[in-house]
């Protein structure tokens, strides 16, 4: 089985990327992808989009240049309990795909046990589809525990 998609990408709306949705869709089509996920950063990351952006995503076409598009967010895990930086209602009503990750502007790095718990709690959240960059060397974690939790909850890493 071959998967031809990229589900963790950012546009200029996230504040640190350099392409528009249309430019990214064209590039994805040129590379032979079948599905592209545009997942802008949630609040807490300097320069990212406001909440209204996520409400407006529903007007963007879900197909460009022959590839399917999904729109979502890379939501910040903000504490050791796996709390998220976006309201559940906004997540449920506006996002096709939901990624959660630890970003140091929004999270105080703790012990291996604390950081692992933060990830596991986010993985156990039924609103989360994917965990972003759990391999960040600045954030010590128990990889085996996280992989087991992801497998049990059908969450991508």
List each language-model region with its residue ranges.
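Extended substrate/RNA-proximal surfaces in nucleic-acid metabolism proteins
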Residues: 2, 29, 42, 47-155
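Single, functionally critical "micro-switch" positions that shape active/binding sites
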Residues: 7, 39, 132
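Metal-associated gating/positioning segment near the N- to mid-region
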Residues: 13-48
